[in-house]
């Protein structure tokens, strides 16, 4: 199919691989087809007439149709991932060298406006930017299959890491300052101050944000291993990952860490521009502010998430149905929390939700409604009791898309 799409787009040879535009278009078409199919089935249309008389059979058929369509969307997304990586790789390189060009234009305009002419400091600043951009270009080439420069900022869950992004920004500024001082010495400057007295605050902040990367990774790894945090791999990184949690909701601890670090970083860059002959002199009050922001960020990492838990299991009752005990073939409603981990609300992860009922593993059916799904949800699951479940006392547990199993609750099944 990829070869056919490449030919349709005018590729000269199938050896060139699939066309990136076709891959993106194929993914968009798959998403549109899934949404249309979900909304059609939500209104009761499209179900085979032979199954319409059986609510259980029609619900299972609808769930299987949606699951297959969701897998198609996921497959299309994986095919488009390579094209996205190429675009991101090129875009980041364009941004890096665009920043160098902007610096050159800014220096030229300020030199003309102030009438100071081109100085050795301007040459050193431009040279440091070119060297740093060249280093980033080389690093991007090594990781071009994962998005170039942004690959250094990706976490294990394929999301942009807030701690890594902040640490990378401070590291780039520190390297730029060192290259600037080195080039100032090369150009013959005599007033370059290489003492650490003025740059001690910068070094402390750099150590803080670097330690934060290690600590955040350790906290997340330990909480995932202890099943106190559920992590689902994202389909793609997004800029919003820096300020939001895995579910795309704004996160206060992440946002304050980015804003505080960004504001202090800008002030440090301004101080470097005003005094390019020494490391930026960062006041200790601002260093303390960054330390407080780091502490809040790490405490937020310790508090996020939680283990999924079942509170109760009851017989699902429809309107007009009589109250009765749970019997084979009935629907059971599982009430609790954490059944849909953050980032697992997409259709494909929802299809991996499983209920363990004694020795039987029952997949939770997808029940569509216009614009979403009525089942499963984060707090309730409805699943039919399989016929293979023997009457008697059985234990029920839920296995989420993250692979975490809940506690077990015993129920009595009557014949």
Give a label for each model feature:
Residues 2, 6-90:
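Basic, amphipathic N-terminal segments
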Residues 80-98, 158-172, 237-263:
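Loop-to-transmembrane boundary segments
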Residues 110-126, 186-201, 275-284:
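Membrane-helix interface and helix-disruption motif detector
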Residues 130-136, 202-217, 261-274, 280-303:
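Alpha-helical membrane-embedded segments
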Residues 139-151, 183-191, 212-229, 276-282, ...:
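Juxtamembrane/interface segments at transmembrane-helix termini
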Residues 152-153, 221-245:
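Juxtamembrane inter-helical linkers in multi-pass membrane proteins
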Residues 173-189, 256-277:
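Alpha-helical transmembrane segments and their membrane-interface junctions
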Residues 303-415:
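Ser/Thr/Pro-rich low-complexity tracts
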């Amino acid at each position: 199919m990829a070869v056919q799409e490449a030919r349709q787009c005018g590729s000269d040879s199938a050896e060139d691989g699939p066309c990136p535009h076709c891959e993106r278009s194929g993914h968009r078409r798959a998403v549109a087809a899934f949404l249309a199919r979900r909304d059609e089935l939500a209104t009761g249309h499209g179900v085979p007439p032979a199954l319409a008389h059986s609510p259980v059979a029609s619900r299972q058929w609808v769930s299987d149709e949606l699951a297959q369509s969701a897998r198609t969307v996921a497959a299309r997304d994986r095919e488009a991932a390579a094209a996205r990586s190429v675009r991101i790789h090129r875009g980041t390189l364009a941004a890096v060298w665009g920043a160098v060009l902007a610096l050159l234009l800014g220096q030229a305009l300020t030199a003309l406006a102030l009438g100071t002419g081109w100085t050795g400091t301007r040459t050193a600043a431009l040279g440091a930017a070119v060297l740093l951009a060249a280093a980033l270009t080389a690093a991007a080439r090594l990781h071009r299959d994962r998005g170039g420069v942004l690959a250094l900022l990706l976490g294990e869950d394929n999301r942009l890491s807030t701690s890594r992004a902040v640490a990378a920004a401070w590291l780039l500024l520190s390297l730029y300052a060192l290259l600037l001082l080195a080039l100032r010495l090369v150009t013959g400057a005599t007033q370059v101050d290489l003492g650490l007295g003025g740059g001690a605050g910068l070094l402390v902040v750099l150590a803080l944000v670097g330690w934060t990367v290690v600590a955040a990774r350790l906290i997340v790894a330990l909480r995932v291993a202890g099943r106190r945090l559920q992590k689902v791999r994202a389909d793609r990184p997004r800029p919003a990952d820096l300020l939001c949690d895995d579910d795309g909701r704004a996160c206060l601890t992440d946002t304050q860490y980015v804003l505080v670090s960004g504001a202090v970083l800008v002030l440090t860059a301004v101080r470097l521009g005003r005094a390019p002959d020494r490391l930026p002199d960062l006041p200790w009050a601002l260093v303390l502010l960054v330390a407080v922001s780091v502490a809040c960020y790490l405490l937020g990492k310790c508090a996020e998430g939680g283990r999924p838990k079942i509170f109760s299991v009851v017989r699902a009752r429809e309107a007009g149905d009589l109250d009765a005990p749970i019997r084979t073939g009935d629907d059971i409603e599982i009430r609790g929390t954490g059944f849909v981990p953050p980032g697992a609300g997409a259709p494909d992860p929802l299809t991996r939700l499983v209920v363990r009922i004694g020795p039987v593993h029952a997949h939770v059916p997808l029940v569509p409604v216009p614009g979403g799904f009525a089942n499963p949800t984060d707090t309730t699951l409805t699943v039919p009791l399989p016929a293979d479940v023997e009457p008697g006392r059985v234990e029920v547990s839920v296995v989420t898309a993250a692979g975490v199993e809940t506690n077990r609750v015993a129920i009595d099944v009557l014949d």
